[in-house]
Amino acid sequence: MNLKPAIFAVVIGTTDVSLIPGITVAGATPELTHYTPALDVEYLLTGRPITLDVVPVTPDGIPTPALVTRAVAFDVPKLVVNAGARVRPRVPYVDLGGEPGGDIRRGPAMSCAAAEELASRGRMLGRELGRLGVVYLGESIPGGTTTAMAILVGLGYNAWGRTSSASPNNPKELKAQVVMDALERAKPPPDPLRVVCELGDPVHPALAAIALGVAEAGGVPVLAGGTQMAAAAAIYKAMGGDLAKLHVVTTRWIVEDKSADFLGLMAEVGVKNVHVATASFGESKYEGLRAYERGAVKEGVGMGGALFYAQSMGRDVLKLVEAEYERVWRYVKRGD
């Protein structure tokens, strides 16, 4: 099947789980993780951050995967979808009427009214996007691999310790403890909607709902991301979606991550159409890009989908990414 994207939608949101020290490196500090989704999409659309004059990086200075998505999928129209971000981006976006996610250890992730609104509006948006054909859906939500684990466990899947991390050192014990604390507080919720309300975040149900709408309109939904997309696919399935119509695209770094189990999770949920971008940054002249080969970042902002598409077009992805990397660091150093 030809999976050339007609449009690339990036769904953003936040969860207070990202404020737990050590849970994520998708931001230079825990507090800055609430800015990461806004900065990601501002950079993706404009080539520079707007809300803060800071390119989103890990604590080790490795830049956002939005750099890769922007560099290699430059010719694909982009759409920002706000599912519930604490910091709203200063670029145009579609608002699904959700709310930022809470700390699932302390209380519900969101109100069920907000989750229902996300499902309704997301599905409506998906039906419109589906008329275009192939729709790639990426995400930006620091802490999302932890809430993804919670969603999957809440829906009855064995996801313990199987979701990935933006860090080379996956904090699996900490993530599992957060999920255990959330389950102790909420008990196993009785239905999928309650699972999302109690244990999730705004992004995963939004991804699922948009994908469902795309499929209903005759389009092809492509979840472009890592282990978090197992949770989105599980919600899609629980909403009545046909998994035969759903595709998932990710990076080689996610598939090869020994601290997680991307392929196993996809198989357990029932996703059959899995595609992997085989790009390597091992020969890059830049340490920040070679770090990807050591397990840094791995996915995010639809990077796997962008790489998969670019490689299918025969593009020299490393050359494109290095050129964008050079431009970004000139901007960082000179403010130009």
UniProtKB/Swiss-Prot annotation:
GO terms for molecular function: nicotinate-nucleotide-dimethylbenzimidazole phosphoribosyltransferase activity. InterPro entries: Nict_dMeBzImd_PRibTrfase, Nict_dMeBzImd_PRibTrfase_arc, Nict_dMeBzImd_PRibTrfase_sf. Belongs to the UPF0284 family. PANTHER family: PTHR38811, UPF0284 PROTEIN SLL1500 (PTHR38811:SF1). This is UPF0284 protein Pcal_1534. The lineage of its organism: Archaea, Thermoproteota, Thermoprotei, Thermoproteales, Thermoproteaceae.
